[in-house]
Design a protein with these regions (language model features):
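Multi-pass alpha-helical transmembrane bundle typical of ion/small-solute transporters
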Residues: 2-204
């Protein structure tokens, strides 16, 4: 007979399988924002080259979003390596997190198509901020409920990176209103953020 306490928890494997599936779909859908341009009239190498040149913002949005999704997937994987079980609250934290993940193809496509305007940048950066917040809530809630096998160095690093990413996305959101076309480039700060988080391991 299953104990009532045990029935309130779920193995992490089922959630991780769902996460893998959602990420596979979201990362694949990104390419839909990069359609082959339709050219009316006569064709020439110059005209075709110009049409592809106009796709650079779309290509940038695709690559940026793909790499960010890869970072999120890897962070979630590393975090859940140390989580031994989940309850209903942690499950729904992840479900809402996945909702933000599946919106990325839309926000990335909007950014690529209308990146010089404020609203698409706001949508993309709010999308990123939501992902960062709920990724951090995973670690915060799991630690508070003692769901962690061991708070390893890697786990602590992921917590720091999640917090840092929230601030980067907030900064990018603020840039949306001033340096609109450049706001999304701030996510390059993830590179030094990871290096700093790694260095902090020797102090904490």
């Amino acid at each position: 007979m299953v104990k009532k306490e045990d029935s309130e928890y779920m193995p992490t494997k089922r959630l991780e399988t769902l996460v893998d599936g959602i990420f596979a779909i979201a990362m694949t859908l990104l390419v839909l924002g990069l359609a082959v341009p339709q050219i009316n009239g006569s064709l020439s190498n110059t005209i075709i080259l110009d049409s592809y040149y106009n796709l650079i913002p779309n290509f940038f949005a695709l690559v940026l979003s793909f790499l960010l999704l890869a970072v999120f997937w890897n962070s979630h994987h590393r975090i859940f390596n140390q989580i031994k079980k989940i309850d209903n609250t942690l499950l729904w934290i992840n479900v809402i997190w996945l909702l933000f993940i599946i919106i990325v193809p839309f926000s990335a496509s909007s950014l690529g198509q209308y990146g010089s305007y404020i609203l698409p940048n706001v949508i993309f950066n709010v999308n990123m901020m939501g992902i960062g917040i709920f990724l951090y809530l995973n670690t915060y809630y799991a630690v508070s409920k003692n769901f962690i096998k061991e708070e390893t160095t890697q786990f602590k690093k992921r917590k720091r990176v999640s917090i840092g990413f929230i601030f980067i996305s907030l900064l990018a959101l603020l840039f949306s209103f001033t340096f609109t076309s450049w706001s999304s480039t701030l996510y390059i700060l993830l590179i030094p953020l990871n290096l700093v988080a790694r260095r902090l391991d020797s102090f904490f």
